[in-house]
């Protein structure tokens, strides 16, 4: 294994690899900011542009439907132009979308801005974790590949804070500044990422062996580790291990994603089917368990629980952002020590309990007309607990796991397919939550999410093997074993 040369313990995280992953993950801060700030902006958009609940649902969810398109395009795009330039493209799209939203003279223009930004989100959510995973060593891949989700949480918290302070501005100015200010960091990132190296795995897949090896030497902890990683990637790319050329023609090999969809969807091997099931399953359950309802509609949920003033609503919502960021940061430190599987099962188990408590608290509060103090406190504690349990496991592990389980030649488009499922579920929840609460009450909606989370726990327990500490090439071999051997790797959780 590349991280355990001659039986030595893995060295500390490579600083240059960490810098690369942080810069790539900044695009996730911008996306997170949009999610957080939209929860407050919609309160004022509804009043300023005289929109109804259905229009608000469409406005919040359309970004994710467009992100679906972006994510499906991102896999092939990143295989052709590279991971780095795909991040640049994502930044430019999000910048243009932010400018349109900041202008927003009417609902159609605002909607077009959300669509443009959504395309950028789709590109970013697919490529940032893949880039980080391909830069990182196996012993620190969980840390680096979880950075995008940590940055999403930081962005959400920033959005909640901006909501609180900009809400004091005149209404027609406040919400436009909330949405438009995201154009500035998008522009900075587009230039900043150009100073970062390309993914060494992508370069080697293109036959650019010398460039790929030079970058591996920069992001590895020793020359021996770099050489071992280099040989592993060459083998995965189908390059003769004895080849010492600087550049190799990759004739007949799938270097730009040709034929990959056939291998993924039409004629997958048993191993690829198993990878697809686990990767798409974890993306499905991440949003089907209701996290977007709390993040996007937090002010409305807390209003149902009994909080009335806008200042108090935004302050309590900031608490959601603090919990999310704190526990995501904790998860980044634990992923490579505790492992993906144990954290995931603990996380989802806690979510089931918290969602049940939230459903009960909101039901009691609504039945009493929002005048039960204990029901209000229970609802706030349960919402915070739900976000905390989500953030320490299911939140970051979804992106880490799906970026590392696909074989090298299928990784970019496999990851893009996972993001597509993720965005569909995000859009489904965000575009239906208000209608759902009208049909079965807000408390009933969270009881339903608790049931989904319980199903998710069983799915993860029986189907997801541990990948902690394994190189990407070793993970590929893990999924090629028969089902009994894979289940044997799981242990007793």
Swiss-Prot record:
Keyword annotations of the record: Membrane, Sugar transport, Symport, Transmembrane, Transmembrane helix, Transport
Keyword Chaperone included in the entry's annotation: no
InterPro entries cross-referenced by the UniProt entry: MFS_dom, MFS_sugar_transport-like, MFS_trans_sf, Myo-inositol_Transporter, PLT1-6, Sugar/inositol_transpt, Sugar_transporter_CS
CDD domains for the chain: MFS_PLT (cd17437)
Membrane-related topology note: Multi-pass membrane protein
Membrane spanning residue stretches: 25-45, 54-74, 85-105, 116-136, 142-162, 177-197, 275-295, 313-333, 343-363, 372-392, 414-434, 444-464
GO MF annotations, alphabetized: carbohydrate:proton symporter activity
Its job: Plasma membrane sugar-proton symporter.
Protein's name in the database: Probable polyol transporter 6
Gene source species: Arabidopsis thaliana
């Amino acid at each position: 294994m590349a991280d355990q040369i001659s039986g030595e313990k893995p060295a500390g995280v490579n600083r240059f690899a960490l810098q690369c992953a942080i810069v790539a993950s900044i695009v996730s801060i911008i996306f997170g900011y949009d999610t957080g700030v939209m929860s407050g902006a919609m309160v004022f958009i509804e009043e300023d542009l005289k929109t109804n609940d259905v229009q608000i649902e469409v406005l919040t969810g359309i970004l994710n439907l467009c992100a679906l398109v972006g994510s499906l395009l991102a896999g092939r795009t990143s295989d052709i132009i590279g991971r780095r330039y795909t991040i640049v493209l994502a930044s430019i799209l999000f910048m243009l979308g932010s400018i349109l939203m900041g202008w927003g003279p009417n609902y159609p223009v605002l909607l077009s801005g959300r669509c443009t930004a959504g395309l950028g989100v789709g590109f970013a959510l697919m490529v940032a974790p893949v880039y980080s995973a391909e830069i990182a060593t196996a012993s620190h891949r969980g840390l680096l590949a979880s950075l995008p989700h940590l940055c999403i949480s930081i962005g959400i918290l920033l959005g909640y804070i901006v909501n609180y302070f900009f809400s004091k501005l005149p209404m027609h100015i406040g919400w436009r500044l909330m949405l438009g200010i995201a154009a500035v960091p998008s522009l900075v990132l587009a230039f900043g990422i150009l100073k970062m190296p390309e993914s060494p795995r992508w370069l080697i897949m293109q036959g650019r062996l010398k460039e790929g090896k030079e970058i591996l030497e920069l992001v590895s902890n020793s020359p021996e580790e770099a050489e071992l990683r280099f040989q592993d990637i060459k083998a995965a790319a189908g390059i003769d291990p004895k080849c010492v050329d600087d550049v190799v023609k990759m004739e007949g090999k799938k270097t730009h994603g040709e034929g990959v969809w056939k291998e993924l969807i039409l004629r997958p091997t048993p191993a690829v089917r198993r990878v697809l099931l686990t990767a798409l399953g974890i993306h499905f359950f991440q949003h089907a368990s209701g996290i977007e309802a709390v993040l996007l509609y937090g002010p409305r949920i807390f209003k149902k629980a009994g909080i009335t003033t806008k200042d108090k609503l935004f302050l309590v919502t900031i608490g959601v952002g603090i919990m999310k960021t704190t526990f995501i940061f904790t998860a980044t430190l634990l992923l490579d020590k505790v492992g993906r599987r144990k954290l995931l099962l603990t996380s989802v188990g806690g979510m089931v309990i918290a969602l049940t408590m939230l459903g009960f608290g909101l039901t009691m509060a609504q039945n009493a007309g929002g005048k039960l103090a204990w029901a209000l406190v229970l609802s706030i504690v349960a919402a915070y607990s739900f976000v905390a349990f989500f953030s320490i496991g299911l939140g970051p592990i979804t992106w880490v796991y799906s970026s590392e389980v696909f074989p090298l030649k299928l990784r970019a488009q496999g990851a893009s397919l996972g993001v597509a499922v993720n965005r569909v579920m995000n859009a489904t929840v965000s575009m239906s939550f208000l209608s759902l609460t009208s049909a079965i009450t807000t408390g009933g909606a969270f009881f339903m999410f608790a049931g989904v989370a319980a199903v998710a726990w069983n799915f993860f327990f029986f189907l997801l093997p541990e990948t902690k500490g394994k190189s990407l090439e070793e993970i590929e071999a893990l999924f090629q074993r028969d089902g009994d051997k894979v289940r044997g790797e799981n242990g007793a959780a």
